[in-house]
Structure formats: structure tokens, C-alpha cells
Design a protein with these regions (language model features):
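N-terminal capping/lid subdomain adjacent to the active-site entrance of alpha/beta enzymes
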Residues: 1-127, 132-141, 145-149
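Glycine-/acidic-rich phosphate or pyrophosphate-binding loops and their flanking alpha/beta elements
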Residues: 57-59, 167-170
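Acidic/glycine-enriched edge-of-secondary-structure segments
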Residues: 70-76, 169-178
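Glycine-enriched alpha-helix->loop->beta-strand junction motifs that scaffold or abut catalytic
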Residues: 95-97, 121-123, 145-153, 171-179, ...
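Catalytic beta/alpha-barrel core
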Residues: 99-107, 128-133, 150-162, 177-186, ...
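A short acidic, amphipathic alpha-helical/loop segment
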Residues: 116, 166-169, 193
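Short acidic active-site motifs
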Residues: 139, 166, 189-190
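Beta/alpha (TIM)-barrel catalytic core signal, keyed to glycine-rich beta->alpha loops juxtaposed to Asp/Glu
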Residues: 187-195
């Protein structure tokens, strides 16, 4: 329905939502099971605080676009040469400022691939990794802590997406590398618990 409303208004959905007043936007949300972490009044206050500089941010997004990242070079099974070539193409030709590599099958392969990727993209392009839930918590911590030399922006799905406490434990242990969840978040309750536990950042 939101997509239809945005199309009727002749604007992208992000802009339609961004132009709403905080109270109007919050009134569209269901806060059931959430108010121990965030009340509607607190949400309005957060959004009201975000109004500062909003016009400039919208102008920037309309002119430049929203920053994305490329997963093209990051698939497991690519030769080092193919991964490096794709990393250079995505960043130097297509202009991506971040790439993401899959990791988690073999630590030596991961270290080699990350070193080659970082060399190919240079220090100014962000590099992230995605483990696709392959590790338990101790393995994730051990493995990711070997990645600090590559200046990672974040690691996605280091363990089961249902393990909120595990993600929080990992996040504390690998700091300053951030933890991200993927597309597997099952409910707003889990999302709330992630926020309460500082399990991603």
C-alpha cells in the first residue's frame, strides 16, 4: 500500500515517508510489544530531532542518490583474479564506495581474499563481510578478530539470527567492527531485543 501511495504522489517512497511529520509517521506504526523499548512519544522525539538538516539531506539524496554497496566481487568460489577484477570494476568503474565478501568456509582463504580485496580497493573504500550464519559464537569471535587488519566496516550474520545474546556477545568482542543482521529477522520482537541488547550497530 505504501508503494501505491508513493506512486500516486509521484515520488519515491523514501521521500514520501521523509516528508511526513513525525507525529503522522509514528501514527502509522503499531507499537504493540515494543513500548518497553520505545514508546510512541520517544519515537516522535527521535524523529523530531532528526528534522534538523533534513532539507539538506533530502537535497543531497536527490542529487547524489543513496549509497549502496556491491556484492558482485564477493561470492565464494571465485578465483582470486576474478574477485580482484570485479572489486576494481565495481569500485573504480561503477563508483561503489563499499563491497561485501562472503566468508566463513576456510580462515586461510578468507585472510588471503580479504588482503587481496583491500589491496585492490584501497583504504578509502569500505569493506564488509557476510558469514551467512555459519559460525557459533566462539568461532565467530575468533575468526572475526583475525580480520582487524582489513579495516572492516561490518560483519553480517556471524551466527544464527535468532541468537540475540550471541550477536551481542560477538559485537562486544569484535569492537570496533560492527555487527549487522541480514534479511532473516523474523519479527519486530527480535528486532526490539537486538536493540535492547546492543547486538548490532
Amino acid at each position: 500500500l505504501w508503494d501505491i501511495k508513493a506512486k500516486r504522489a509521484g515520488k519515491p517512497l523514501w521521500l514520501l515517508l521523509g516528508e511526513m511529520e513525525p507525529e503522522e509517521l509514528v501514527s502509522t506504526l503499531d507499537f504493540r510489544y515494543m513500548t518497553d523499548a520505545l514508546t510512541p512519544a520517544e519515537a516522535v522525539e527521535i524523529l523530531r530531532e532528526g528534522q534538523k538538516g533534513k532539507a539538506e539531506r533530502i537535497k543531497h539524496l536527490l542529487e547524489v542518490g543513496y549509497p549502496g554497496y556491491s556484492t558482485a566481487p564477493g561470492w565464494l568460489g571465485y578465483s582470486d583474479e576474478k574477485m580482484v577484477a570485479l572489486a576494481k570494476e565495481e569500485t573504480q568503474v561503477k563508483g561503489f564506495k563499499q563491497i561485501k565478501l562472503k566468508v566463513g568456509q576456510n580462515i586461510d582463504d578468507d585472510l588471503r581474499r580479504l588482503a587481496k580485496a583491500r589491496e585492490a580497493i584501497g583504504p578509502d573504500v569500505r569493506l564488509a563481510v557476510d558469514a551467512n550464519q555459519v559460525w557459533d559464537v566462539p568461532t565467530a569471535i575468533d575468526w572475526i578478530n583475525k580480520f582487524h587488519d582489513f579495516d572492516l566496516a561490518w560483519v553480517e550474520e556471524p551466527t544464527s539470527p535468532d541468537d540475540v545474546i550471541g550477536h551481542a556477545t560477538i559485537a562486544r568482542a569484535i569492537n570496533p567492527i560492527k555487527v549487522a543482521t541480514g534479511e532473516q529477522m523474523q519479527s519486530r520482537i527480535l528486532y526490539k531485543q537486538y536493540l535492547q541488547a546492543n547486538a548490532f550497530g
